Amino acid sequence: MRVIAGSAKGIRLGRAPAGVRPVADRVREGFFSSIGARIEGARVLDLYAGTGAVGIEALSRGAEHTTFVDSAPSAVAAVRDNLRRTRLDDRAVVRRSDVRRFLERGRVDPSGFDLVFLDPPYDAGPPELDPVLALLDVKPLLRDGFTVALSRGTRSSNGVIPLHWLVARRLSYGDSVVTLFRSRSLPRTPGSMEV
């Protein structure tokens, strides 16, 4: 696993800890190609960060800042190690926390995020993910023009799409699907979701 483009291009990232499924190079490459120049100067939130490969790729490609969140101590250590390897740690914050708890009570960046990438375990279903997506929708975390990207296995069950989001694009790579969500212009009622 390596950084694909940008200031840290070609730097090898450390091995994924046991139980962590890193986002494949081709998935990252396709995802970043699809969002293009919007990564320049973006504030990024990498949820279920694993090795940090997605957030590090964002930093390497010109993102202003990335916040990494994962609950596993081994994943947090891997993210920190990979940030040191790439010398991008001065533009990053790493938090060890359950994702839902982080969104409910964590020290979330008050300036908001332009891009949120979620790569939960493939076995995480709607009971875990729907509340996370709802929190992203109702809390003032997302900047105007945001993109939320959800990486799932092709056999993973689908959840509920927050009412204020629309599916902008689906990218398929073997056994992985990345769904890109964007803002839909609707009045906001806390907790509103679309089935």
Spans of features found by a protein language model:
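Class I S-adenosyl-L-methionine-dependent methyltransferase catalytic core
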Residues: 1-195
